[in-house]
Amino acid sequence: MNEAKRILLEGLWRNNSSLVQLLGLCPLLAVSNTATNALGLGLATTLVLVCTNTAVSALRRWITGEIRIPIYVMIIASVVSAVQMLINAYAFGLYQSLGIFIPLIVTNCIVIGRAEAYASQRPPALAALDGLSIGLGSTCTLLLLGALREVLGNGTLFDGADQLLGAWARVLRIEVFHTDTPFLLAMLPPGAFIGLGFMLVGKYLIDQRMKARQPKAARPVVLQQGQPLADE
């Protein structure tokens, strides 16, 4: 398995930042009330991860170990500010919906963790790919949880997609079933905790099934003291 494929597989599944490392749970639980909000924040976080990892990797030779963390935070804050202005300019409805959680990307453990653990020790191309894979893994988790909560809570899917993608995206709205009274448990943070719990269980079961399908490695035979060999 080459390095690029391993990085993608690690970020998307094996070492998923939300389902394995359990990082970034604050925005995961607070913003995933709709699929649109989840997708918007996930894409913003992915863009920040790619840009931050690339910048940290490119500057790693000139960043001394004693002051590396403050410099990483400054780089992350600069990128997040640029992304925030882009969302404000081109997706103002989404900007209002996400609110404080866009600037809070600066304090996201996923971003600073990848800058410290991976980007500071790898070339820019691999660092950018790592940021992309980690970001897409987090986005997929956000999107799945947001879609689950939106369907159970409001009976819709991608409601308000025009806030993210423009007026044409109104056609993406799907009404799975009609309801006059939203299911508040699914829309509130307790529903996010419950949904995340089911997703963790689902990933565990899938991993166990995949492990069971793998051929068992030959186990070495350990002879006890005094036990004769088979050919003796």
Swiss-Prot record:
Keywords: Cell inner membrane, Cell membrane, Electron transport, Membrane, Translocase, Transmembrane, Transmembrane helix, Transport. Its main location: membrane. The chain crosses the membrane at residues 12-31, 39-59, 69-89, 92-112, 125-145, 182-202. It is a multi-pass membrane protein. Part of a membrane-bound complex that couples electron transfer with translocation of ions across the membrane. HAMAP family: RsxE_RnfE. Belongs to the NqrDE/RnfAE family. This is Ion-translocating oxidoreductase complex subunit E. It comes from Sodalis glossinidius (strain morsitans).
